[in-house]
Regions:
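Short acidic/His/Gly/Ser-rich catalytic and metal-binding motifs that mark active-site loops
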Residues: 233-237, 301-304
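Hydrophobic/aromatic beta-strand patches that form the interior of the parallel beta-sheet core
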Residues: 196, 225-227, 352-354
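Accessory regions of macromolecular translocation/handling assemblies
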Residues: 1-222, 248, 266-270, 291-294, ...
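Short, conserved catalytic or adaptor-binding loops enriched in Gly and charged residues
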Residues: 236-240, 345-348
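P-loop NTPase motor-domain active sites and their immediate coupling elements
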Residues: 2-15, 37-44, 262-420
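Mechanochemical coupling/switch segment within NTP-driven translocation systems
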Residues: 223-225, 230, 237-292
């Protein structure tokens, strides 16, 4: 296995010339073999015959071993990368051996790393888009590309896709404080990287993902408020967590945000009085529980009353800007993540961004950010899409399958009641 060991790849161009000479020579030897019996004795003929047979078998095995069909994973990757170099003309043709782009690859922590070294040759314009070509050739998801070193590009591929979480009661019992597991590899450290935007059209799985986040927060002794202007799925939770925690009108949502703002003031006073309002300290140092507001399609109420709408935007901006230290967090859900729905100044302060279901490119950019020219190859269907989490060192979003509620595995409303 080639884990953590770098394997070098170059395209020498010997396929077209030297290999042709080699196999032509084998054919000549075979032709001579047919004529030899009349000129040499039987014993010598047998030795020559077996020599040519063995050389032929070794050649056939070598061709197979170094091909894309090889039983060796390392050789399969190597052959495919040579094909990428050849097909994209990332070499300078020489008389015998071409001067090509050099690649190195290795596996580290379930990911395949491929490094491309241009070595002064003008491949840079091609290298920026080469990751998508390699992604297609290897049939692996490109999850990151980096140009943080002057002499190389690094492409990171997901070798083994993360396992989806299937929601069960035991899952919430094992949750770490301040952290919510999202799949077998990803988690959201909301205490350090606060607030979330969840975007997705009807049927994309957005609501169930929000249910999962609400359950996760409740299992960590959080206070959760819900604003649902459409009075749909989330609104029904008022019968479980209490009517005073669920609002649907413009004034009701403004009221929740006022409570969140006032909670920040209260916590600031507590932390100041107890000497905890120091650099690097937050709500956890005084054993305060998270205080969360979940708002689904908050833009719906903004047209009802412009004065209240302005108050909502002002309070929302204040809570998102200052809430992290005080343990006050916001989750925004929407079908249309445009600037009218969620102002850019607010979106830029959100750490967790998730798109679920089929979304057009513009919607993906508004949700995930404008800094990404490419997205990894991934399915956009119910409960599946893309995710970006601040603080993880990612340079691009990654594919994501949201936690799944299996039929009859967990009663959602009973679970909310249990953890409330």
């Amino acid at each position: 296995m080639f884990k953590n060991r770098k394997t070098k790849v170059r395209f020498y161009g010997i396929n077209s010339k030297l290999k042709l000479y080699y196999y032509a020579g084998l054919l000549i030897l075979l032709a001579l073999l047919m004529a030899l019996p009349m000129y040499i004795n039987a014993e010598l003929f047998k030795i020559v015959k077996w020599f040519i047979v063995i050389i032929s078998l070794i050649s056939i095995f070598f061709e197979y071993f170094t091909s894309e069909l090889s039983f060796s994973e390392s050789q399969r990757i190597k052959a495919k990368l040579k094909k990428v170099i050849r097909d994209n003309k990332l070499f300078i043709k020489r008389v015998f051996l071409n001067d090509s782009l050099v690649m190195k690859f290795y596996i580290k922590e379930k990911h395949l790393y491929i490094e491309a070294y241009p070595k002064g040759v003008d491949y840079l314009s091609k290298l920026e888009k080469l990751g998508k070509v390699i992604e297609t050739t290897l049939n692996l998801s490109l999850i990151d590309s980096q140009n943080n070193k002057a002499d190389r590009f690094t492409y990171i591929f997901e070798k083994n896709k993360p396992n989806r979480i299937y929601v069960q009661h035991e899952l919430f019992q094992n949750n770490r404080k301040g952290i919510i597991s999202l799949d077998s590899e990803k988690s959201w450290n909301y205490s350090k990287y606060p607030h979330a935007i969840i975007a997705g059209k009807t049927g994309g799985g957005k609501t169930y993902f929000i249910y999962y986040l609400i359950l996760s927060f409740l299992s960590q002794n959080s206070t959760v408020f819900i604003g649902d202007p459409k009075q749909k799925d989330l609104y029904s939770l008022k019968h479980i967590i209490g009517e005073k925690y669920v609002e649907s009108s413009a004034n009701g949502i403004a009221k929740i945000l006022r409570l969140m703002y006032e909670e920040m003031d209260k916590r600031n006073e507590i932390m100041t009085q107890n000497g905890l309002n120091d650099f690097g300290k937050d709500y956890r140092d005084y054993n305060l529980a998270p205080f969360v507001g979940v708002f689904d399609e908050i833009s719906v109420v903004k047209n009802d009353d412009l004065k209240v709408a302005k108050e909502i935007d002002r309070l929302l901006a204040q809570v998102i800007m200052k809430g992290r230290q005080y343990g006050v967090f916001v989750i925004l859900a929407t079908q249309k993540p445009d600037a009218d729905t969620i102002p850019t100044s607010i979106r830029d302060e959100v750490s967790l961004r998730v798109s679920l279901g089929k979304m057009y490119r513009e919607g993906l950019k508004m949700t995930l950010g404008d800094d990404f020219d490419e997205l990894p190859a991934g399915e956009q269907s119910q409960g599946q899409g893309f995710i970006f989490i601040d603080g993880e060192g990612w340079s691009m979003p990654r594919t994501f399958k949201s936690p799944w509620f299996k039929n009859n595995e967990i009663d959602l409303f009973k679970a909310v009641s249990k953890y409330n």
